[in-house]
Amino acid sequence: MKTPPWVPRSSSGNTTLIMKLSTASNMVLALLSAGLVACTQMNETPTYGDFLAEHSKDYPATMEVYMDEAQMAKATPKSPIHICLEQQRGRLYVDGQVAADWPVSTGKEGTETPIGTFRIKEKKKKHFSSLWGTIVDENDICVVESADSRKDKVPAGGEFLGAKMENWQKLTNDGVGIHTGQVRAGKQLSKGCVRTPGFVADALYNITEVGSKVTISRKPEAAWPGNEPPKEQ
């Protein structure tokens, strides 16, 4: 009996990485969770279809990430990136195939993530928001935990500290972008940005360039293999 291709995520709720490696004869699954790496060998290479089938009961609300190493190696700045708000998932396509599928947390009610097709305007490996962050007083004591620099006043001697956003990729002029951030499966948590698990945000950052296209939609994109086939009339 062969080992199942998908490793359950840890009880701590951390993101796990299910990686499809290119050597089919000696498949390795790398689990990245709380600094722990576990490897399992298989005789068959699981596909994205296998990933969806295995998670038929919990997808899209799972913290597991699918990555095809061979496809990721072929990704270019022109490889399409899709963010689905309804599913709270992001997907990268290479040669028309899903190369990666990961959980995201987008804008919550009142600060919803905009829908549309965007071009990356700016990239910064280490970025601090000029809009969102915290405000501390002259004694470095936090006085506003979730501050909006446009509305919240800084007390005399105090300071606004912008939220840290690594792997920053700006999409809109009003400060919406993709970046490393806290993600909870199926939950909209941000002020409008697309929060992404760190290792995924890092991988995307290394693939894209200024001008790369990112599409954000309410429903899953037409190319997604999980879409139900049209019903016969």
PLM features: what roles do these ranges have?
Residues 27-36:
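Bacterial N-terminal signal peptides
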Residues 24, 81, 102, 118, ...:
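A broad, low-specificity signal marking well-ordered, structured residues that form hydrophobic/aromatic
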Residues 14-28:
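Bacterial N-terminal signal peptides that target proteins for export
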Residues 2-3:
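Polybasic, lysine-rich low-complexity intrinsically disordered segments
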Residues 39-46, 111-115, 134-233:
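Exported/periplasmic cell-wall-interacting domains
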Residues 40-160, 166-167:
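Cell wall/extracellular polymer interaction/catalysis modules
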